From Swiss-Prot:
(2E,6E)-farnesyl diphosphate 1 binds at H18, S19, K20, S21, Y41, R45, R171, Y248. Binds 2 Mg(2+) ions per subunit. A third Mg(2+) ion binds between the 2 farnesyl diphosphate (FPP). The lineage of its organism: Bacteria, Bacillati, Bacillota, Bacilli, Bacillales. It catalyses: 2 (2E,6E)-farnesyl diphosphate = 15-cis-4,4'-diapophytoene + 2 diphosphate. Pathway: Carotenoid biosynthesis; staphyloxanthin biosynthesis; staphyloxanthin from farnesyl diphosphate: step 1/5. Keywords: Carotenoid biosynthesis, Magnesium, Metal-binding, Transferase, Virulence. The keyword Magnesium applies. This is 4,4'-diapophytoene synthase. Its cofactor is Mg(2+). Belongs to the phytoene/squalene synthase family. CrtM subfamily. It comes from the Bacteria.
Length: 287
């Protein structure tokens, strides 16, 4: 195993640890594509964790400087400051793919702002956040998952990322509240007459369910729109993207089956993932 192979293996471990659903799906890509996904996921995870886990703004700055070095001089040797193994893997990817570096910087800017979290006044602010933390990831992955990236390809990948982030929010309402965060907008909370603290303390009510389903309908519509345009991605990537997205959309039904609980994180069981895999395998005849 070469040093570069070890770098990619390190990135893969990060992906498997933090997103079993993504790993389950994207590990089915051809080797070069899945390695690129591992590297990009690992970079994005380190960006997220720099503040959420480490509380280290200097580390986030180092990540940004390392990415800037790769963008400016992709073929030169660099003394990376953040995580050398991840950055070497990203540099290798950047030498072969047209990486959307600005999307990395947009993600970093969102993480900067997230240090001083305040509730969103409107849904527009919420959806802007979903773009910043997840739509950006879709943009960065676009050259990996398509043969000829176009404006439409970037748009579809961005919407998929935003949809998956909204699903994360719908899954983690209780956990986020425990961390003193409420992502639903004040505008929508007022409209549906919902107080998250009250729901957390006293249990789910019809007002909360209606609010939750309002946002779930948005995520489900975006999912359907993405599936309708799945052919913008490469033949190899189409079934993988559909598998990842369908596993994620299943999370919404898991929340429903758990009676919209705020006190337990739901997940999609392995047998359901396997069932989806076989359905999509039959549809595409190529996974």
């Amino acid at each position: 195993m070469t040093m570069m192979d070890m770098n990619f293996k390190y990135c893969h471990k990060i992906m498997k640890k933090h997103s079993k659903s993504f790993s389950y799906a994207f590990d089915l890509l051809p080797e070069d594509q899945r390695k690129a996904v591992w590297a990009i996921y690992a970079v994005c995870r380190k960006i997220d964790d720099s503040i959420d886990v480490y509380g280290d703004i200097q580390f986030l700055n180092q990540i940004k400087e390392d990415i800037q070095s790769i963008e400016k001089y992709p073929y030169e040797y660099h003394h990376f400051q953040s995580d050398r193994r991840i950055m070497m893997a990203l540099q290798h990817v950047a030498q072969h793919k047209n990486i959307a570096f600005q999307s990395f910087y947009n993600l970093i800017d969102t993480v900067y702002k997230d240090q001083h979290f305040t509730m969103f006044e409107t849904d527009a602010e919420l959806f802007g956040y979903c773009y910043g933390v997840a739509g950006t990831v879709g943009e960065v992955l676009t050259p990996i998952l398509s043969d000829h990236e176009t404006h439409q390809t970037y748009d579809v990948a961005r919407r998929l990322g935003e949809s998956l982030q909204l699903i994360n929010i719908l899954r983690d309402v209780g956990e986020d509240f425990e961390n003193e965060r409420i992502y639903f907008s004040k505008q929508r909370l007022k409209q549906y007459e919902v107080d998250i603290a009250e729901v957390y303390q006293n249990g789910v009510n019809n007002h909360y369910i209606d609010l939750w389903e309002y946002y779930a309908a948005i995520a489900e519509k975006d999912f359907r729109d993405v599936m309708d345009q799945i052919k913008v991605f490469s033949i190899e990537a189409q079934p993988i993207i559909e598998l990842a997205a369908r596993i994620y959309i299943e999370i919404l039904d898991e929340v429903r089956q758990a009676n919209y609980t705020l006190h337990e994180r739901v997940f999609v069981e392995k047998r359901k993932k396997a069932k989806l895999f076989h359905e999509i395998n039959s549809k595409y005849h190529r996974i």
